A protein has these predicted regions:
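Single-stranded RNA-binding surfaces
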Residues: 1-256
């Protein structure tokens, strides 16, 4: 069924309605001041390492330093995927052997600041796409647990073929197929893979050229999530009441 998307934008709030045959099927609202930090990627600077707590405070340019626990450090566990149970249960590598004060560290917010507590961080980066989640530092190919078990292996084989060899130019990384990607075509999945890898390339490039305490990647706002998640072959029109935001959407669509 064909759909129309109506967008009302103001500096304080964005509202999106998805219509089918003139009837509202979905309504999304995002208030600017209530946007969280989860998903944002920063180039942080280690401010303090606390061996007793197996954690570190990271300055990411916010009012309060953010918190990084050893369990959220990439490479904290010596075991590799597929290792036996004894290796998987091996102790974590102590945080003081992995990070040091003054070190620049790429981190992602996994929990928003609450009260007097700063944001919680991870060095294990994940980037959400329309149908996939990209794990650029991993090689795992996962399938949503909500997809029937009988279909997962075939989907995993498809994903491995579409992702290509890890040593290919622009290749590498792991993916998780989200539930809404179960019936996606190869072309749709390949498009999402390309978008996610391009996003990661931009993040890496920014991490080289920007100083510590810089924002490298901000999770998409509602307008861009509309383009990523809602616009498809059945979309016959998008109506937006802001010329400036219309130009931003055009630029986003052309770039990705």
């Amino acid at each position: 069924m064909q759909q129309d998307i109506l967008i009302n934008w103001s500096p304080q709030e964005t509202r999106v309605a998805v219509l089918e045959s003139g009837a509202v099927q979905e309504l999304h609202v995002e208030r600017t001041l209530e946007r969280g930090l989860v998903g944002n990627v920063y180039l942080g600077k280690v401010a303090r390492v606390l061996p007793g707590m197996q954690s570190a405070f990271i300055d990411i340019g916010l009012e309060r330093a953010a918190f990084l626990h050893v369990a959220d450090l990439l490479g904290a566990h010596p075991a590799v995927r597929g290792a036996n149970s004894e290796e998987r249960d091996a102790p974590l590598v102590p945080i003081e052997k992995q990070v040091f004060e003054g070190q620049a560290l790429m981190v992602q917010v996994i929990k928003d600041p609450i009260g007097t507590k700063g944001a919680r961080l991870s060095t294990q980066i994940s980037i959400a796409g329309r149908m996939l989640v990209f794990l650029p530092q991993d090689d795992h190919m996962g399938i949503s647990q909500k997809i029937p078990l009988a279909q997962r292996e075939a989907l995993r084989l498809r994903m491995n073929a579409l992702a290509g060899p890890p040593d290919a130019p622009g290749g590498g990384g792991g993916f998780i197929l989200r539930t809404n990607g179960e019936d996606a075509s190869d072309a749709e999945l390949a498009e999402d893979i390309a978008y996610l890898r391009k996003t990661w390339a931009r993040i890496k490039d920014a991490s080289v050229h920007l100083p510590p305490q810089s924002l490298l990647h901000q999770d998409l706002d509602l307008l861009k999530r509309v383009m990523r998640d809602l616009v498809g072959e059945l979309t016959q029109s998008i109506r937006l009441d802001s010329r400036e935001q219309f130009q931003n959407l055009l630029a986003f669509g052309q770039e990705f």
